[in-house]
């Protein structure tokens, strides 16, 4: 027969619970039979595993909160930088279009200037 990993995990937890109950019953028997030895028995807090009550957990939690805050701020800064890069790219495209349009206007003005110079040269040559 095969057991899934979930069955094995729940079986282990049940086994620990049973051992804890048996150990607690033994402690109660010792207390009722030998009250003098009750001082040597472990307290209930010593037998229950401390889940999340270790001395460094407060610092660790604070560290993770700080780390999360730093990561959030850095993510916001990255998004802001990407936004600025996109905006700058759009503005550069606008400037490039304007320069191209002005370049065409300048070329047209040069052609008109050349036509005027040719016409003036023709008029000057006719007068001479």
UniProtKB/Swiss-Prot annotation:
Topological category with respect to the lipid bilayer: Single-pass membrane protein
Sites bearing Phosphoserine, chain numbering: 24
Subcellular location: Membrane
Transmembrane feature ranges: 66-86
One Pfam entry name: DUF4577
Any coiled-coil regions, as ranges: 90-111
Keyword Transmembrane helix applies: yes
One Gene Ontology CC term in the entry: membrane
Keyword terms, alphabetized: Coiled coil, Membrane, Phosphoprotein, Transmembrane, Transmembrane helix
Disulfide bonds: none
Principal subcellular localization: membrane
Protein name in UniProt: Leucine-rich single-pass membrane protein 1
Record organism: Mus musculus
Gene, per the UniProt record: Lsmem1
């Amino acid at each position: 027969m095969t057991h899934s990993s979930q069955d094995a995990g729940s079986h282990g937890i049940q086994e620990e619970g049973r051992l804890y109950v048996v150990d607690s019953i033994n402690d109660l028997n010792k207390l009722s039979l030998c009250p003098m030895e009750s001082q040597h028995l472990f307290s209930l807090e010593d037998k229950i595993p401390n889940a999340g009550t270790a001395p460094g957990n407060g610092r660790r939690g604070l560290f993770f909160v700080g780390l999360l805050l730093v990561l959030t701020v850095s993510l916001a800064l990255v998004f802001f930088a990407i936004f600025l890069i996109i905006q700058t790219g759009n503005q550069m495209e606008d400037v490039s279009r304007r320069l191209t349009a002005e370049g065409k206007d300048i070329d047209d003005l040069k052609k008109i200037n050349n036509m005027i110079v040719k016409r003036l040269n023709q008029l000057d040559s006719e007068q001479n």
